[in-house]
Amino acid sequence: MLTKKQKNLLLFINKKLRASGVSPSYEEMKDSLNLKSKSGIHRLISALEERGFIRRLAHKARALEVIKLPETASANDIYNSFSPSVIKGGLDTENTNLNEMEIPVLGSIAAGTPVEAIQNEVSRIPLPSNLEKNGQYFGLKVQGDSMIEAGINEGDTVIIKRSDTADNGKIVVALIDEHEAMLKRIRRKGKTVALESANRNYETKIFGPDRVKVQGVLVSLYRNF
């Protein structure tokens, strides 16, 4: 069983590796745990290595590989995932956590239809009060279970903020080859773009950079209970 600091360090290393493909520096690890010196990080890494959670890569400075994560780690811990801002009660009940602004729902994200091609909105929903009103938003109904380990379930209505850029690790609406839209986690590395599901049963899809266009970033969702 890992100590709290060992677990937190392991999850931080995993998060950095998944976001950038590069191990965090000892300084970054020290700061993440609010430690005063790097010697404590050295001890924690040695303990994680002895227990079989990480491995130091030979001939590479500061290179670590996460071999496994603790069984007590949640899906959010493992995937550094979007933590959904769920509007309780869904769309069928009066909710005080809403403001007067409404946004369009443009269809289903798993339908393979690019957002620009959807001319007629399906419905309108209130914009959650925690989101900035000056952004451009739209909703999409989720079909399928490819993002369940990020807390996104089939039947949810995801709220997307329009944007043509996104940081590594963000969940986005990605348009593939100008005709297929996907809700995936995006990671760019070199001359490739990876679109990751949050479900171990689905493979990561790899594309050239000219084949993928970001149409928006996931910011919230509605869920009917």
From Swiss-Prot:
This is LexA repressor. Its EC number is 3.4.21.88. Residues 26-46 bind DNA. One of its GO terms (biological process) is SOS response. It catalyses: Hydrolysis of Ala-|-Gly bond in repressor LexA. Represses a number of genes involved in the response to DNA damage (SOS response), including recA and lexA. In the presence of single-stranded DNA, RecA interacts with LexA causing an autocatalytic cleavage which disrupts the DNA-binding part of LexA, leading to derepression of the SOS regulon and eventually DNA repair. The lineage of its organism: Bacteria, Pseudomonadati, Pseudomonadota, Alphaproteobacteria, Candidatus Pelagibacterales. GO terms for molecular function: DNA binding; serine-type endopeptidase activity. It holds the Pfam family Peptidase_S24. It is an enzyme of class 3 (hydrolase). SUPFAM superfamilies: LexA/Signal peptidase, Winged helix' DNA-binding domain. Homodimer. The keyword Cytoplasm does not apply. CDD domains: S24_LexA-like. Keywords: Autocatalytic cleavage, DNA damage, DNA repair, DNA replication, DNA-binding, Hydrolase, Repressor, SOS response, Transcription, Transcription regulation. The gene is lexA. The active site is at 146 (for autocatalytic cleavage activity), 184 (for autocatalytic cleavage activity). The record marks 111-112 as: Cleavage. The keyword DNA repair applies. Belongs to the peptidase S24 family. Coiled coil: none annotated.
